[in-house]
Amino acid sequence: MLSTRVEKLSSGRLLRIARMGSGPPVVLLHGYPDNLQIWSELAIRLADQFEVIAFDWPGMGYSEAWPGGTTPFHMAERLHKILDELAIERASLVGMDMGGQPALVFAASHPERIHRLVVMNSLVLWDEKTSWEIQVLRKYGWNRFILRKFPRLVFSRAERTFLPLGRKLPSELRADLWKSFSQSDVRFFIARLCAGYQGTLMQLPEAYKKITCPTLALWGEQDQHFPPNHARRLCATVPGSILKIIPEAKHWMAWYLADTVAQTIRTFLA
């Protein structure tokens, strides 16, 4: 587990953060139902060469929500403000799941603030195939209802489908993820987040075309929620981007295949 602290930002709002290592900064952006601890295995493997920063998105994990919208554009601007607060002038970004879209938008909007970009296992195209679970959760009414009434179902389904059969999260990590996801205000924010993302997915490819930094689409071959064709089409849109598919890997490969993922990222960032 990563050692964390809660920082009070200039706005007075609280942000949970983990920061370790030294070298060029690398910022890790999580999705849901996780929080920054999903990076626990990857972060320690990158910290020998980089300063690694992971935080709970405002409104998720154990960070306080911020006012305003919930589209990838809003989330990218929150990332921008957080980097300012942390005095990080320029960083590489690694975004997974719902951390991928804000990372892409940030790269397009703030090219002077990003060194390199890694996107993993994310819903990046509105018209590409997803799992039936994601199809349901992309409908705001169903999304809001399921997240409000059946959080254990959502969380347990993620565990079963994000990991290989028979693989389980260690109890301490699982407890941290579940404790944050079980909070009703976190799930309410996630429902809004899903709606905000769904409403802007059609606009995102225009942003992707503006990205100029070196970009790696790093995908799990067996991510059933966002199959590798998302990555292939993303690479066809982002100029000069690179595609790497990890054989047999599933959605949470950053945790259970941390050695492989870390080596791939280190090579790309070198």
Residue ranges and their predicted role:
Residues A54-G95, Q263:
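Active-site loop/oxyanion-hole signature of alpha/beta-hydrolase fold enzymes
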Residues A249-A258, A262:
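Catalytic histidine-centered segment of alpha/beta-hydrolase-like enzymes
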Residues A108, H115-I146:
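Flexible "cap/lid" loop of the alpha/beta hydrolase fold
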Residues M1-V26, A47-F50, D84, I88-R90, ...:
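Alpha/beta-hydrolase fold catalytic core
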Residues A18-Y62:
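Conserved HGGG/HGGXW glycine-rich cap/lid loop of the alpha/beta-hydrolase fold
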Residues Q222-F226:
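Acidic catalytic loop of the alpha/beta-hydrolase fold
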Residues I211, A217-W219:
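Short beta-strand/loop motif that positions the catalytic acidic residue
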Residues T130, K149-K209:
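Conserved alpha/beta-hydrolase catalytic His-Asp/Glu region
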